[in-house]
């Protein structure tokens, strides 16, 4: 098989026909021409479609090409567990409602609810009801309290005697057993009548055993008739005894005149 082409010489030089691919002047040997065809027309090109090239399809049965099926729209049905049942026209009558514009909408916030730019939601709650108060079971029902017969206002003070100088009035069970530091230091007590210590020696509580107390020993009797007592070894009586001298009481029970130091402060 040879291919004849029209070269440049054919057009302008006597219309000379040249067998371009099989011209003897182009290839010295036939082996070169065979190599040329093998390189450009190899069998690898026809490997994939070799079966189609050499098979005659004239005897194959006729397959009718059908048109594309008509697509019908899919109807989505609501699930009974997911949506509410449909309502009839009578039960759910549709009314044409025109949505109001922003300039025709009524104000939903009343001026009473708006307090300094903050909505007062407590006005929307139901009114509070007062709970019935139950009587106190611990309190005894002994009747009403008697009216206070004391006159209002400050009572009249005695002539020239203040409450601090007079001293607090205590029962025998509430009498102090120690002297105040202001008496020992000869200073002013800032607590006044509310002080829990005695401001006078006569205000101290006496021993309930008296002469039968087994923790003291009589040392001597002073010229003024007062007694000078002392504690027995291994025993201390913290109370004042009758006719005991003040010096005897202070010697037997030394009073602390200094406040205890705070160990944290240096």
Swiss-Prot record:
A zinc finger (C3H1-type) spans 180-192. Keywords: Metal-binding, Zinc, Zinc-finger. Residues 105-119, 160-176 have a biased composition (Polar residues). Residues 88-100 have a biased composition (Basic and acidic residues). One of its GO terms (molecular function) is zinc ion binding. PROSITE patterns: ZF_C3H1 (PS50103). Signal peptide: none annotated. Residues 84-176 are annotated as: Disordered. Belongs to the IIV-6 077L family. This is Putative zinc finger protein 034R.
């Amino acid at each position: 098989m040879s291919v004849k082409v029209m070269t440049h010489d054919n057009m302008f030089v006597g219309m000379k026909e040249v067998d371009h691919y099989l011209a003897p002047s182009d290839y010295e040997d036939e082996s070169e021409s065979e190599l040329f065809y093998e390189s450009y027309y190899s069998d690898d090109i026809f490997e994939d479609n070799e079966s189609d090239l050499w098979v005659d399809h004239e005897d194959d049965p006729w397959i009718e090409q059908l048109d594309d099926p008509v697509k019908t729209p899919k109807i989505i049905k609501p699930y009974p567990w997911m949506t509410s049942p449909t309502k009839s026209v009578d039960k759910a009558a549709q009314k044409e409602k025109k949505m109001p514009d922003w300039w025709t909408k009524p104000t939903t916030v009343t001026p009473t609810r708006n307090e300094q730019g903050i909505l007062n939601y407590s006005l929307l709650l139901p009114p509070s009801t007062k709970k019935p108060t139950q009587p106190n079971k611990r309190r005894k029902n002994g009747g009403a309290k008697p009216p206070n017969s004391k006159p209002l206002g400050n009572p009249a003070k005695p002539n020239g005697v203040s409450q601090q100088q007079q001293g607090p009035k205590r029962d025998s069970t509430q009498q102090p057993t120690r002297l105040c530091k202001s008496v020992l230091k000869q200073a002013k007590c800032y607590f006044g009548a509310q002080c829990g210590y005695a401001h006078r020696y006569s205000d101290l509580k006496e021993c309930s055993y008296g002469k039968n107390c087994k923790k003291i020993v009589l040392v001597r009797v002073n010229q003024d008739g007062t007694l000078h007592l002392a504690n027995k070894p291994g025993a201390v009586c913290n109370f004042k005894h009758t006719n005991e001298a003040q010096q005897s009481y202070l010697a037997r029970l030394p009073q602390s005149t200094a406040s205890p130091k705070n160990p944290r402060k240096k």
